[in-house]
Amino acid sequence: RSEVESWQRLTRVLTHEIMNAVTPIQSITQAYIGSKMVKGTPLEEGILAIYDTSRSLSAFVESYRKMTQLQTVNLEEIDLQRLVTNLQTLYPNLTWHVDLANVQTLRADASMMHQVLTNIVKNAAEAGAQNIDISARRTDQCTQLRISNDGTPIAAEVAREVFVPFFTTKRTGSGIGLSLSRQMMMAQGGNLALAERAQAGYHTTFVVTL
């Protein structure tokens, strides 16, 4: 654990130093892009390249920062129905099928749970899903949420990589959503997994365990 914490501290220092160097480059080149002395001249292409590269580097460093700076976990009894209702409000164009059985509350971090479920549903929507099914079951050992969607199925070779940091099949994706979500679940004493077999009638099922 101490080794992991040391690496996290080192990463925080490095990201801070890199951002200190990149931010002024990004600001200065952005200012020059619209100026008369650059626009339409041979300099414009070079400055645009520097600006785009600095923006990409900033986004990459920010992704690393998110991976190493999980907020403090605040476990409390949260209203599961309210959590799901908030998701439905965020994605009104999806058709929702909800079966929470007798699971009314979860002992979890509210903001983390919201982000985890939002990441899962966001990915489903981006994969072309039209239907989302959320079911909850409680046993003596744990509470399990299953989130299923009918979007484009995840290929077997991709399924092995979905929780790997920075792995993405999207042209503009950062590849940290599911990895960060799993970290959040583990920080709460739970887990996030991709089911080997999707629920009947759906293409993909994620399982949240607490």
Residue spans of the language-model regions?
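Short beta-strand/loop element within the Bergerat-fold HATPase_c
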Residues: 131-141
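Conserved DHp (HisKA) dimerization/phosphotransfer helix of two-component histidine kinases, i.e.
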Residues: 28, 41-93
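Conserved catalytic submotifs in the C-terminal HATPase_c
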Residues: 97-105, 111
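Short conserved segment of the HATPase_c
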Residues: 154-165
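Short alpha-helical Gxxx[C/S/T] motif in the catalytic ATP-binding
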Residues: 177, 181
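Glycine-rich ATP-binding loops of the HATPase_c
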Residues: 189-197
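Detector for a conserved hydrophobic position within an alpha-helical segment of the HATPase_c
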Residues: 185-186
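Conserved micro-motifs of the catalytic ATP-binding
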Residues: 69-73, 105-108, 169
